Amino acid sequence: MKIGFNEGCNRFCENHSVLEDLDLCEKYGVDYIDIQSECLDREIAAGKYTIDDLAAWFADPKHHLKMLSYNALIFFNMKQTQEEKDAVMAKLDQIIEDCNKLQCKMIVVVPSMDLTVPATLD
């Protein structure tokens, strides 16, 4: 049996850290981690590390923890304008590039919840 950790379980905890999650997963024998994009993006924007730093961590043979999935491309569907669609595709392209560096083969997608128009046509 393999054990995975969903970072969504603690993403709102005070002083949350992706790197600390990685270390704790290693310490307690977790096999896979589902990294939350909002946590990752927040810490990269704050200059705590880069995607390349994180990729080096996962590539280091002393670590057994693997990345299960990138969570998530959010609110990707039901876009009304070409500009909105292009923005989603640009974000997806960036996620794919990052996932390739992180040796991650799965992307979680979350459908839109904030629709102002009906999702179906009559």
Positions of predicted regions on the chain:
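Short, contiguous strand/loop micro-motifs
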Residues: 7-9, 40-42, 75, 79-83, ...
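Acidic (Asp/Glu)-rich catalytic clusters
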Residues: 20-29, 46-69, 90-103
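Active-site acidic/histidine proton-transfer and metal-coordination neighborhood
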Residues: 16-23, 78-122
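Boundary/entry segment of secreted carbohydrate-active catalytic domains
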Residues: 1-16
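Hydrophobic faces of well-ordered beta-strands that scaffold small-molecule active sites
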Residues: 3-7, 33-35, 66-72, 107-109
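Glycine-rich, proline-tolerant flexible connector loops at the mouths of alpha/beta enzymes
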Residues: 34-60, 111-119
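N-terminal substrate-binding region of glycoside hydrolase catalytic domains
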Residues: 24, 28-46, 71-76
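Residue-level marker of alpha-helix boundaries and capping positions
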Residues: 11-13, 45, 86
